[in-house]
Amino acid sequence: RKPVWLRINPEGGYFLGVEFNRNAIHCVALDFTGKLIYDAERNIETSEKTADQVLELVKKMIYDGIAFLGEKSKKVIGIGIGIPGYSDANRGIAISYSHLKDWKNIPVKDILEKEFHVTCYMDNNVNVMIFAYKWLVYGGKCEDMLFVSIRTGARVIPIINNQPVRGTCGYSGELGHVKVSGGSRICSCGRYGCLNSEISDVAIVNKIIDGIKVGRFRE
């Protein structure tokens, strides 16, 4: 029998992914081969929003992605969401986020599954980034690695035997609110000297602004 070349049908199914942080909500759509076919972002300021408002914006971004797919949206297999702060991925619950004060014990997975009637997967946005990096850069072949993320917060997550080390309560690697020697800036959590208040992207911008004010840097 002659060999037959086979390939994955890109229209076999579609996936939607959404991630939000302090400053923006980002939504993408992928075909069955993992090719990016839709990419949208909306700027927000979560500290000025309520949890319900952020969830509605997340839903709106997902609906926009579904509208882009049109008839193909009937083949959406699942939705993945990466959320900031502390979370329980096994139960699909967002526990807390310091930039969104009423973001407490939100059943994000259940809310989205009831809204869109497809399977949803929820995890911390850094954990989601780890798996994306692992597959896109190493083709999933790297079983052990250490991932460092410094954005609005600082987190270090090890992957051992293809699994992120989450810790007993799921807080493993959350270094942002560890107090550092000499830290004097107020953190979003209300304390002084947290690592986030010294090395996060927001902290760096604030330091530059302060430097401009005292003439250390030029505008």
Predicted stretch roles:
Residues 2-39, 147-160:
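Gly/Thr-rich phosphate-binding beta-strand-loop-beta motif of the actin/hexokinase/Hsp70
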Residues 36, 94, 164-165:
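Hydrophobic "anchor" residues
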Residues 195-219:
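A mobile "lid/hinge" subdomain adjacent to the ATP/sugar-phosphate binding pocket shared
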Residues 57-68, 119-120, 180-202:
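Short, solvent-exposed cationic patches
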Residues 41-144:
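Glycine-rich phosphate-binding loop and adjoining helix at the ATP-binding site
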Residues 141-198:
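Glycine-rich phosphate-binding loop of actin/hexokinase-like ATP-binding domains
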